[in-house]
Swiss-Prot record:
Subcellular location: Cell membrane
Keyword field contains Signal: no
The protein, known as: Phosphate import ATP-binding protein PstB
PROSITE patterns, per the entry: ABC_TRANSPORTER_1, ABC_TRANSPORTER_2, PSTB
Purpose of the protein: Part of the ABC transporter complex PstSACB involved in phosphate import. Responsible for energy coupling to the transport system.
Taxonomic lineage of the native organism: Archaea, Methanobacteriati, Methanobacteriota, Stenosarchaea group, Halobacteria
Quaternary structure, from the entry: The complex is composed of two ATP-binding proteins (PstB), two transmembrane proteins (PstC and PstA) and a solute-binding protein (PstS).
InterPro entries per the UniProt record, alphabetical: AAA+_ATPase, ABC_transporter-like_ATP-bd, ABC_transporter-like_CS, P-loop_NTPase, PstB-like
All copies of domain ABC transporter, residue ranges: 48-302
Length: 307
């Protein structure tokens, strides 16, 4: 991949297995040995590619030399202690860091082998293809129906042209089909189908988060980024979100940040471990990372010796 420098301007089955990580000693970092890791190859196509990614906020470096390939239609978990760069990395994947005026990004991020940081990239289209669900549910203060239909209507994705008229499908019919499909895909339809005109802010926290996922699905993304989507939810609501993520990964590429290592072990095919200093220390098959980590630092983190 070609390297770019970008400064922001806006305010398991075998199909998912990876090679084992190989570390080499390059010097000591505090009491630990820093490991270098090599890229993994997957048996499924790569959806997102990251090469030598550095991120700075002013003079502070948040990510250092991150390289990884994220396979399509799977769940990739990002774990590590607070402040290690997980969310910064996630936000690089659809250029949400553009909104941070002090951010500077060096390196390469590709979507289907196309560089997303090159000049001329349409950010609206990019963020439709790579959607994001945030830590705290953020439904619009509108009806449940309007929350789903807002994006497609704003971007003209509901067909109002000749073909729709020839097929005898009105705008309202298309809208209702979209709303039902997205709510079903987000496992929410059965709970809200008889109150679609109610204000979304009246839903429970777990329902609001699933509505936000449905809203993300309404613009037909290819990748769904999730930043701690269940951290504010109770165990029952969390279980529903985890079940939903498993279903979504059959059709979408899911990348999730979580502080909950048990959650990462339950729902992901591959896991990336970030540690202090914005360093990606280990990345590979989830079972191997948790059961037989190649890095002593990762083993110490997973077993609770630090972090």
């Amino acid at each position: 991949m070609s390297e770019t420098t970008y400064t922001t301007t806006e305010d398991t089955d075998d199909t998912n297995s990876t090679d084992s990580m190989v570390g080499t000693t390059t010097g000591e970092t505090d009491e630990y040995v820093r490991e270098e890791w090599r890229e993994y190859s997957f048996d499924v196509p790569t959806k997102l590619g990251v090469d030598d990614l550095d991120v700075y906020y002013g003079d502070d470096q948040a990510l250092e030399g991150v390289s990884m390939e994220i396979p399509e239609k799977s769940v990739t978990a990002l774990i590590g202690p607070s402040g290690c760069g997980k969310s910064t990395f996630l936000r690089c994947l659809n250029r949400m860091n553009d909104r941070v005026s002090s951010a500077r990004i060096d390196g390469s991020v590709t979507l289907d082998s196309q560089e997303i940081y090159q000049d001329g990239v349409n950010l609206v289209e990019l963020r439709k293809r790579v959607g994001m669900v945030f830590q705290s549910p953020n439904p619009f203060p509108k009806s449940i129906r309007e929350n789903i239909a807002y994006g497609p209507e704003k971007h003209g994705d509901i067909d109002t042209g000749v073909l729709a008229r020839l097929l005898g499908r009105s705008d309202e019919e298309q809208r209702e089909e979209l709303v039902e499909r997205c709510l079903r895909d987000a496992a929410l339809w059965d709970e809200v189908h008889d109150r679609l005109d109610d204000n979304a802010l009246g839903l429970s926290g777990g329902q609001q988060q699933r509505l936000c996922i449905a809203r993300c699905l309404s613009v037909d993304p290819e990748v769904i980024l999730m930043d701690e989507p269940a951290s504010a939810l109770d165990p029952i609501a969390t279980a529903k979100i985890e079940d939903l993520i498993a279903e979504l990964s059959k059709e979408y590429t899911v990348v999730i940040v979580t502080h909950n290592m048990q959650q990462a072990a339950r729902i992901s095919e591959q896991t990336a471990v970030f540690l202090t200093g914005g360093e990606l220390v280990e990345y590979g098959d989830t079972d191997q990372v948790f059961e037989n980590p190649q890095s002593e630092r990762v083993e110490d983190y997973i077993t609770g010796k630090f972090g």
